[in-house]
């Protein structure tokens, strides 16, 4: 579950116990992350992200949660490398997270896993 107000992604096991809490950066005010219930549609170990004003190749550990692949959960090494902390809205709508957490989530989340994004 992604909580937009707390800028955290909480992972639960099948018994609804918290397994991991991950700091994230979701969409900034001008490009907000939508609130919705979905699932993991596609997974890419590395992919290129495209937007109106950007192209970012090699985005690691990407899991798309919208059928059109517009909203994804992924690592943001450029944010880490720039020293910009997670927990602050910074994206164009995706859910960014540190590389180590994105790697873990990618390897522990199969396609079809339900995803909730809430305010």
Task: Describe the residue ranges of each PLM region.
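Cell wall/extracellular polymer interaction/catalysis modules
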Residues: 1-31, 35-37
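Active-site donor-binding loop signature of nucleotide-sugar glycosyltransferases
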Residues: 24-26, 42, 75
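Exported/periplasmic cell-wall-interacting domains
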Residues: 31-37, 44-119
